[in-house]
Amino acid sequence: MKIDIKTVKAVYSMLIATSVLRELGLPPADEIEFELLPVSDKVMATYTPDPDTIGVCPERHRFLTSLIKSMVHEIIHMANHYYGKSYLRHDKNFEQLRKKIADEFGFDENEI
């Protein structure tokens, strides 16, 4: 699948509109910076705060489900930042939110 900024922004908007993510009160897509990452960065996706930025490597996502799972992963990092937790770690807070979202979406939590 071809992934561009418009697609990444649309996936983010769709995800934060779901009931499980809507309750987190995250900012709309227009308040987030989105970027396409080169494959040389050796990551699927990233989140950095101040300003909120989500980056995605198009070459590492062949299917929409992969992009959705990566976006959920980065949204969890963002949520941790907004709630005063470490956005860098996959700690207890990260794991609890990941499980809640995975259960709601019908995903294997280890794939998020």
List each language-model region with its residue ranges.
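Generic detection of long, well-ordered alpha-helical segments
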Residues: 1-10, 87, 91
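Active-site recognition of the HExxH zinc-binding catalytic motif
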Residues: 69-81
